[in-house]
Amino acid sequence: SLSAKDKANVKAIWGKILPKSDEIGEQALSRMLVVYPQTKAYFSHWASVAPGSAPVKKHGITIMNQIDDCVGHMDDLFGFLTKLSELHATKLRVDPTNFKILAHNLIVVIAAYFPAEFTPEIHLSVDKFLQQLALALAEKYR
């Protein structure tokens, strides 16, 4: 679980991420689709899954907006993400492993954007937060 320090660390770095969240979301999603090409299967209905394409940009923004909402609900991620978990489990049928893959790609992009601010301590807190988020999204798969 997230300690008070973890929550403070996430909120601190999120304040820096937020102004660039559209770019970060698009780059993290683009990176995931290139490095883990099996994830493209979930987006076959898009006109293009190429990095920088309009659907990738749009979904990157959607993802980051949802994560932004989660930053404000760190004390109840499971409750907060119930409907989104149901959607991914029952309608979209996304393999929950992909939530961790996206989390990894987000960390890579955040580290590239904020090399000085993304200290090992911040990295640990962000990783714990994103893993909790991934776990909450996977809740309805059980």
UniProtKB/Swiss-Prot annotation:
Annotated tissue distribution: Red blood cells.
Pfam family, one: Globin
Domain Globin, chain residue ranges per copy: 1-142
Disulfide bonds, paired cysteine numbers: none
Taxonomic superkingdom: Eukaryota
SUPFAM superfamilies for the chain: Globin-like (SSF46458)
Binding positions for heme b per the UniProt entry: H88
One GO location term (cellular component): blood microparticle
GO biological process, one term: hydrogen peroxide catabolic process
Binding site for O2: H59
In-chain residues carrying the UniProt-annotated modification N-acetylserine: S1
Entry keywords, A to Z: Acetylation, Heme, Iron, Metal-binding, Oxygen transport, Transport
Alphabetized PROSITE patterns for the sequence: GLOBIN
InterPro entries: Globin, Globin-like_sf, Globin/Proto, Hemoglobin_a-typ, Hemoglobin_oxygen_transport
MF-aspect GO terms: haptoglobin binding; heme binding; metal ion binding; organic acid binding; oxygen binding; oxygen carrier activity; peroxidase activity
Quaternary state and interactors: Heterotetramer of two alpha chains and two beta chains.
General function of this protein: Involved in oxygen transport from gills to the various peripheral tissues.
Family that this chain belongs to: Belongs to the globin family.
PANTHER family per UniProt: ALPHA GLOBIN-LIKE-RELATED, HEMOGLOBIN FAMILY MEMBER
Name of the protein in question: Hemoglobin subunit alpha-4
Organism annotation: Oncorhynchus mykiss
